[in-house]
A protein has these predicted regions:
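N-terminal, non-cleaved signal-anchor transmembrane helix
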Residues: 1-78, 245-358
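Short amphipathic alpha-helical coupling elements at transmembrane boundaries
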Residues: 64-68, 99-109, 122, 156, ...
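Alpha-helical transmembrane segments of multi-pass membrane proteins
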Residues: 67-72, 76, 105-109, 159, ...
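Hydrophobic alpha-helical transmembrane segments in multi-pass membrane proteins
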Residues: 72-80, 84, 114-118, 186, ...
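Transmembrane-helix boundary motif in ABC transporter permease subunits
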Residues: 76-105
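Generic hydrophobic transmembrane alpha-helix motif, especially the helices
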Residues: 106-145
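Membrane-cytosol interface at the C-terminal ends of specific transmembrane alpha-helices
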Residues: 132-199
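Non-cytoplasmic
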Residues: 195-259
Length: 360
C-alpha cells in the first residue's frame, strides 16, 4: 500500500493554482500571442517604389494598431534603459569620459526629436532594406524622446550616492557587476522609474511623425495608432480621430495600471529616507502578482543566469574606486586625454572638409 500524502500537503498543493495564477497565466499567454501577431508584420517587404500609406482605417483594425504602437513604445523603452545603464555608468565612474559624455548628452537632449529622422531614416532603410528598417527608424525616434531624460536621472543618482553605501560596497568586496545590480540600480530605482514613466508619456506625442515616414518623396506608413490618426486627419474624419483618441487614452491608462503603477509601488522598498512616506503608492496588479507563484518562478529561472554572470564578470575586478588620487598623475592623464580628443576632432573636421570639397 502506497504512502498517502498528508491532508495539509494536499491542500497546499491545491492552493498553488489559484484564481490569481489563472488570471496571470492567461495574461502572459495573451501577451505572447499579441507579440507574435504583431511580429508577423515584419515579414512584409517594403521597397522604395511602393507606398504603404493606404492603411485600412476600419474600427476592427484598431486593436492591432494599438498593439503595434505599444510594442514599439516598450521596445524603445527597453533600448532606452540599456543605454541609460551603460552611458550613465560610464559617465559617473570614469572622470575623463564624464567630461565628454555629459556635454554630448546635453547636446543630444537639445536636438529636436524630429531632427533625428532626417538622417536616421535613410540609414536604417538602407541597413535593413525592408520594413524592419522603417520599424527601426520609428523605434529610434521614440528612443530619443525617452533616453536622455532617463540617462540624466540615473547619472545624478550615481553621483549623489551616500558615502556609507559606498563604504558598505567596499566592505563586502562586491565586484563591479555586483555593485551595479545590488547598489547602483536599487539606489536609483525610484528616480529611474518615475523618469521612465515621464519619458514614456512624452513618446506618445511623436508616434504620428514616427509611424509616417517620407523617403525619396514616397510616404511609408507603419501600422499603428499614430499613423491611423494621421490618415484620419487627412481624410477629415473627426469621428475616427475621436475614437482613436479614446483608444489611446485607454492605452495610456492601461499601461499605467498594469506596468508603471506596479513598478512605482514596488520601487518604494528601495527608498532610503529615514522617515517613511505617509502615503505609499499601491497597486492592485502588483498585489495580484504577489498572490501568485509568478515572481517565484521568475526567480528560479533567472537565479542560475545571475550566478553565471557573477562568475564571468569577476575578472573585471572589485568595485574599489580609489579614495586618494595622485594629482600630478591625474594632470598628466588629463593632458594626454585632451590631446587625444583634439586629434580626433581635427581628423573629423579634416574629413568633413574633404567631403564638402568633393561635393562642390
Amino acid at each position: 500500500m502506497g504512502r498517502r500524502t498528508p491532508i495539509s500537503n494536499r491542500l497546499s498543493i491545491r492552493r498553488r493554482v489559484s484564481a490569481a495564477d489563472v488570471v496571470v497565466g492567461f495574461g502572459v499567454v495573451a501577451l505572447l500571442y499579441g507579440i507574435t501577431r504583431v511580429g508577423e508584420s515584419l515579414s512584409v517587404n517594403v521597397t522604395p517604389g511602393s507606398s504603404t500609406a493606404r492603411l485600412p482605417t476600419g474600427l476592427s483594425h484598431l486593436p492591432y494598431y494599438a498593439a503595434c504602437s505599444l510594442l514599439r513604445m516598450f521596445v524603445a523603452l527597453g533600448f532606452s534603459t540599456a543605454f541609460t545603464f551603460i552611458y550613465a555608468t560610464a559617465a559617473a565612474r570614469m572622470r575623463r569620459a564624464e567630461m565628454v559624455l555629459i556635454p554630448v548628452l546635453d547636446i543630444l537632449q537639445s536636438v529636436p526629436i524630429l531632427g533625428f529622422l532626417t538622417f536616421t531614416t535613410i540609414f536604417f532603410f538602407r541597413l535593413f532594406g525592408n520594413v524592419v528598417g522603417l520599424e527601426a527608424t520609428c523605434i529610434f525616434a521614440v528612443f530619443t524622446s525617452q533616453a536622455w531624460n532617463m540617462t540624466f536621472s540615473f547619472y545624478h543618482s550615481l553621483t549623489t550616492q551616500p558615502r556609507d553605501l559606498d563604504e558598505a560596497a567596499r566592505l563586502y568586496r562586491l565586484t563591479k557587476w555586483q555593485r551595479f545590480w545590488k547598489l547602483d540600480v536599487p539606489s536609483s530605482m525610484i528616480g529611474l522609474v518615475w523618469n521612465a514613466m515621464m519619458s514614456m508619456g512624452g513618446g506618445w506625442f511623436f508616434l504620428t511623425a514616427a509611424e509616417a515616414i517620407t523617403i525619396s518623396g514616397r510616404n511609408y506608413t507603419l501600422p499603428g495608432m499614430g499613423s491611423y490618426i494621421g490618415i484620419a486627419i487627412r481624410q477629415g474624419s473627426l469621428a475616427k480621430v475621436g475614437i482613436a483618441v479614446v483608444v489611446m487614452i485607454i492605452m495610456v491608462v492601461g499601461v499605467n495600471a498594469v506596468f508603471f503603477r506596479p513598478l512605482v509601488a514596488w520601487a518604494e522598498k528601495f527608498r532610503m529616507e529615514d522617515s517613511a512616506s505617509g502615503d505609499k503608492p499601491k497597486s492592485f496588479f502588483l498585489n495580484l502578482l504577489r498572490r501568485t507563484d509568478f515572481a517565484r518562478f521568475i526567480g528560479v529561472v533567472t537565479k542560475p543566469i545571475g550566478r553565471f554572470l557573477d562568475r564571468i564578470t569577476r575578472p573585471f575586478g572589485l568595485a574599489e574606486y580609489p579614495l586618494a588620487i595622485d594629482k600630478h598623475r591625474q594632470r598628466r592623464g588629463d593632458f594626454a586625454f585632451w590631446i587625444l580628443i583634439g586629434v580626433v576632432v581635427a581628423w573629423g573636421a579634416n574629413n568633413g572638409l574633404d567631403l564638402s570639397l568633393i561635393h562642390i
